[in-house]
Amino acid sequence: MKRVTLLLTAGLVLLTATALPILRAGAQTAVVTDDNLSESIANAKTPADHEAIAAYYDQEAASAEAKAALHRRAASNAKPVGMANMCNGLAQYWDKVAGEDKDLAKAHRAMAKGAGSGS
């Protein structure tokens, strides 16, 4: 009886020792940055991978929206020096970038759902 208990305990310890690192690796999703974006997209397979990429694009869209707002404010201040058109053009550019980033985030969220359904 002691021997069976010892073997079961040893087996459980061995199983835990091998499963724990695997579970931790699966639970850790790397943060997507400018530096690893291409690699993250190329290696994305799980819903968590695509959600991390979508979060990156959400941040990029928010940054672009902030730049657009900055240039809209600058346009109202730049009217006296004749630079309002340039500022408005930059605001439109950043609005377009924000829209594209939102579309990319939406696409990766759709891929996350597809990866989660096994298709």
What positions do the PLM features span?
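Short N-terminal segments immediately surrounding and downstream of signal-peptide cleavage
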Residues: 24-45
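Short, charged, amphipathic alpha-helical segments
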Residues: 51, 55-58, 84-99
